[in-house]
């Protein structure tokens, strides 16, 4: 049986990246919540832009 998690960086960025979060009101709420909590890494995009948690 095939496993459910088949990793792909492209799909990961497209679904959970910064631009995708900014595209919807709820996505912006997610970012605001993560900023308020003091998260070092807001989205998966940050991993590729030098933040690396």
Curated annotation (Swiss-Prot):
Encoding gene, per UniProt annotation: rpmH
The organism's place on the tree of life at top rank: Bacteria
GO BP terms: translation
Entry similarity comment: Belongs to the bacterial ribosomal protein bL34 family.
Basic residues: bias regions: 1-16, 32-42
Identification of the protein by name: Large ribosomal subunit protein bL34
Location of region: Disordered: 1-20, 32-53
HAMAP family: Ribosomal_bL34 (MF_00391)
MF annotations from Gene Ontology: structural constituent of ribosome
Pfam families per the UniProt record, alphabetical: Ribosomal_L34
A Gene Ontology term for the protein's cellular component: ribosome
Keywords: Ribonucleoprotein, Ribosomal protein
């Amino acid at each position: 049986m095939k496993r459910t998690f088949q990793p792909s960086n492209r799909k990961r960025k497209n679904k959970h990246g910064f631009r995708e979060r900014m595209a919807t009101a709820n996505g912006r709420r997610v970012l605001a919540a993560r900023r308020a909590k003091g998260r070092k890494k807001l989205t998966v995009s940050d991993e590729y832009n030098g933040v690396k948690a």
